[in-house]
Amino acid sequence: MVRWPGLRPCLSAILNPAGASNMAAAEVPGYLVSPQTEKHRRARNWTDAEMRGLMLVWEEFFDELKQTKRNAKVYEKMASKLFEMTGERRLGEEIKIKITNMTFQYRKLKCMTDSESIPPDWPYYLAIDRILAKVPESCEGKLPDGQQPGPSTSQTEASLSPSAKSTPLYLPYTQCSYEGHFEDDRSDSSSSLLSLKFRSEERPVKKRKMRSCHLQKKKLRLLEAMLEEQRRLSRAMEETCREVRRVLDQQNILQVQSLQLQERMMSLLEKIIAKSNV
């Protein structure tokens, strides 16, 4: 009789594919585990020392994160810097997820609290507020390149040639028109500077008003959502109470019916006993 050594494992694999897959998974060594399965593992909790180090590293690399779109390498630098500071090794993806979650938590708390009230009781709120408050200085209030203030009276007088001063002025109307033109230029330049100054002063006020209105709208939407959720919960509670009352009423009816049946049984037993005694 001819024996095939590899026939039995092949037949078992064909007849029981689940067992074959389990055996194959068991034979795969640990260093060949895919990164997708690594992501599904539960991440370690962040310690207080790691959080303080993360705040410092985030503040240090904040500008670099904002300047680059594909910032995976920046997160890897942050991970190595955090490892140097705390001795705990974290992946760049973990740091990115943690920063995203903390930013979401910060914005949620900022919308829920008033800007003039006491900050929330979250130990990292002020640190994140300081980090996210970094904005590039605006160039508002500055004159554009190439724009110069209007000519002054002293400059116009200095620009006049000595021959023009020495020659007799037999066209006084033309002279007055030139002087009026210089005065108009000077007044236009001063008025443009004043208007630019007023616009630069009005812009922060408008921004603050728009920001406060935006926050008020967010608060109103949040309060409306909370009110709607409260109404939904109250309706569910009322429905539950009605169901409980209905069940209790049915239970009372069943108890009354059982008592009536017991009384009937007792009366029947008494009649049977009386007849047997006779």
Curated annotation (Swiss-Prot):
<dbReference type="Pfam" id="PF13837">
    <property type="entry name" value="Myb_DNA-bind_4"/>
</dbReference>
<dbReference type="InterPro" id="IPR026095">
    <property type="entry name" value="Myb/SANT-like_DNA-bd_dom_prot"/>
</dbReference>
<feature type="region of interest" description="Disordered">
    <location>
        <begin position="139"/>
        <end position="167"/>
    </location>
</feature>
<feature type="compositionally biased region" description="Polar residues">
    <location>
        <begin position="149"/>
        <end position="166"/>
    </location>
</feature>
<protein>
    <recommendedName>
        <fullName>Myb/SANT-like DNA-binding domain-containing protein 1</fullName>
    </recommendedName>
</protein>
<dbReference type="InterPro" id="IPR044822">
    <property type="entry name" value="Myb_DNA-bind_4"/>
</dbReference>
<feature type="domain" description="Myb-like">
    <location>
        <begin position="44"/>
        <end position="131"/>
    </location>
</feature>
